[in-house]
Structure formats: structure tokens, C-alpha cells
From Swiss-Prot:
Keyword presence, GTP-binding: no
Transmembrane segments: 18-38
NCBIfam families: PRK00753.1
A Pfam family that the UniProt record links to this protein: PsbL
Membrane topology qualifier: Single-pass membrane protein
A GO cellular-component term linked to this record: photosystem II reaction center
Lineage: Bacteria, Bacillati, Cyanobacteriota, Cyanophyceae, Synechococcales
Subcellular location: Cellular thylakoid membrane
Organism: Prochlorococcus marinus (strain SARG / CCMP1375 / SS120)
Keywords: Membrane, Photosynthesis, Photosystem II, Reaction center, Thylakoid, Transmembrane, Transmembrane helix
Name of this protein: Photosystem II reaction center protein L
SUPFAM superfamilies for this protein: Photosystem II reaction center protein L, PsbL (SSF161017)
Assembly behavior: PSII is composed of 1 copy each of membrane proteins PsbA, PsbB, PsbC, PsbD, PsbE, PsbF, PsbH, PsbI, PsbJ, PsbK, PsbL, PsbM, PsbT, PsbX, PsbY, Psb30/Ycf12, peripheral proteins PsbO, CyanoQ (PsbQ), PsbU, PsbV and a large number of cofactors. It forms dimeric complexes.
Amino acid sequence: MQVNPNPNKLSVELNRTSLYLGLLLVFVLGILFSSYFFN
């Protein structure tokens, strides 16, 4: 583990994490809305 990580790599990892969280949020909302409309 590096003591001083590359800030560019860190920002890319943060963007990737936020992207995955956004996709997960859209996926969960899609399931909730589909179950609400088809029920």
C-alpha cells in the first residue's frame, strides 16, 4: 500500500464508485416502480 497515492487514480476510483451507486439506485427504483405498476 502506497503512503502517497496518485490523486488522479483516487478520483477515478471515486467516480467509479459513484457510478456504481447511481446504477444500483436506478436498478432498485426500477424494481419498486415495476412492482408498483404491475401489482
